[in-house]
């Protein structure tokens, strides 16, 4: 499996592109800036889905552009995360320059222990890791773990606001 990290323009959040040489399927972990994601796709590759670590706007502000380009793309999140997709207050975009909500409806709710096959014989496993946000999910496969803001090296994670 190949992984490409993109550091996004808002709050330096990350998007990860997961691909495999034996597949045209591509998966994302979070989606911020869409342009660098599209620039890294090879001819014939299709984004199948995006796994959201949580639904604070800096982790999914590129979602509507993504869905317009890949209308069959599925958004994977927690039940609380689904609420954040459709609430500019819960996703905190209301308090920044560009309030928005998700305009699509292809959402799959994930739970602790779910395993989704992303490539032949390779699954992404789901861990519920509430703290920074009640709906935080962590994903792992092989030797990789994607924590979103549940764990930030050398940084205090904010779990509530004054």
Where do the model's predicted regions map?
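Accessory terminal helices/loops
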Residues: 1-2, 114, 160-161
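Short Gly/Pro-enriched turn/cap motifs at secondary-structure boundaries
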Residues: 6-8, 106-108, 128-130
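Divalent metal-coordination and catalytic microenvironments
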Residues: 18, 30, 54, 66, ...
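Active-site HxH/HxHxD metal-binding segment of metal-dependent hydrolases
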Residues: 33-120
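Metallo-beta-lactamase
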Residues: 91-94, 98, 123-162
